Amino acid sequence: MSSPDQNPSDAAGQTGSSNEEVVDVRRGMFGVKGSGDTSGYGRLVREIVLPGSSPRPYGFYFDEIADRLAEALNRDGVEFEDAIEKVVVYRNELTLHVRREALLRVAQSLRDEPELRFELCLGVNGVHYPHETGRELHAVYPLQSITHNRRLRLEVSAPDSDPHIPSLYAVYPTNDWHERETYDFFGIIFDGHPSLTRIEMPDDWQGHPQRKDYPLGGIPVEYKGAQIPPPDERRGYN
């Protein structure tokens, strides 16, 4: 197995993106409103920033991945820019933001091309950016090439009003339960999944608990003889 350079920080373009996107302004420590602030953290104000598109050269082995993927897509009659919204290099890590209609084609090329060979998908992570209008829901796929000892991420977005993303089950079958969990907690519908049902919450549960618009609540719990109130009734810290 080949080994990549051990010091990617020396590569050109590794420092990150040329533009940054402000998607929200967060106030307070935890974003909870309407409760008493006993800590002083309620006065914190900070911008929530996402890295923008990175310029060439990306550095490290990232340019080679982009070039080989572009060649593979071109052979199938797909332009790189039509499949990839942007390429982001941030903190020495490569993320390809993929248009959802091109996700299956991109994933299959990354898996099957001999010079790419990303044989392993490490799952899928859901993210909810409620203030990123039209792109509120994100699915993030970490990929690894065992052959070439390389890593990258695929990131796909969908609007709240149409939370559909193609399932990668056909390309990476081990994503089965990962996509079910992301559906369960974020409400992303993975089209083509063989059995997209809840995996942790009860079947009749209302809502998706890891979304940022999910209400803070709960039920009282008895612990060592004491009655612990649900989170929304406890002492406030913002």
From Swiss-Prot:
Q: Transmembrane as a keyword? A: no
* Disulfide pattern: none
Give me the reactions it catalyses.
a quinone + NADH + 5 H(+)(in) = a quinol + NAD(+) + 4 H(+)(out)
Family in the record:
Belongs to the complex I 30 kDa subunit family.
State the organism named in the record.
Mycobacterium ulcerans (strain Agy99)
What EC number is given for this enzyme?
A: 7.1.1.-
Superkingdom is Bacteria
> What does it do?
NDH-1 shuttles electrons from NADH, via FMN and iron-sulfur (Fe-S) centers, to quinones in the respiratory chain. The immediate electron acceptor for the enzyme in this species is believed to be a menaquinone. Couples the redox reaction to proton translocation (for every two electrons transferred, four hydrogen ions are translocated across the cytoplasmic membrane), and thus conserves the redox energy in a proton gradient.
Which gene specifies this protein's sequence?
nuoC
What's the protein here called?
NADH-quinone oxidoreductase subunit C
Cite the HAMAP family for this sequence: NDH1_NuoC
Recorded hits in SUPFAM superfamilies, A to Z, give: Nqo5-like
The region called Disordered is annotated at 1-20
Q: Which residues form a coiled coil?
A: none
Q: Which GO terms describe its cellular component?
A: plasma membrane
According to its record, how does it sit in the membrane?
Peripheral membrane protein
Fetch the PANTHER family from UniProt.
NADH DEHYDROGENASE [UBIQUINONE] IRON-SULFUR PROTEIN 3, MITOCHONDRIAL (PTHR10884:SF14), NADH DEHYDROGENASE UBIQUINONE IRON-SULFUR PROTEIN 3 (PTHR10884)
GO MF assignments: NADH dehydrogenase (ubiquinone) activity; NADH:ubiquinone reductase (non-electrogenic) activity; quinone binding
Alphabetically sorted, this entry's keywords are: Cell membrane, Membrane, NAD, Quinone, Translocase, Transport
> Could you describe the subunit structure of this protein?
NDH-1 is composed of 14 different subunits. Subunits NuoB, C, D, E, F, and G constitute the peripheral sector of the complex.
Signal peptide annotation: none
Its localization reads: Cell membrane
Q: Which Pfam families match?
A: Complex1_30kDa
Please state what class of enzyme this protein is: translocase
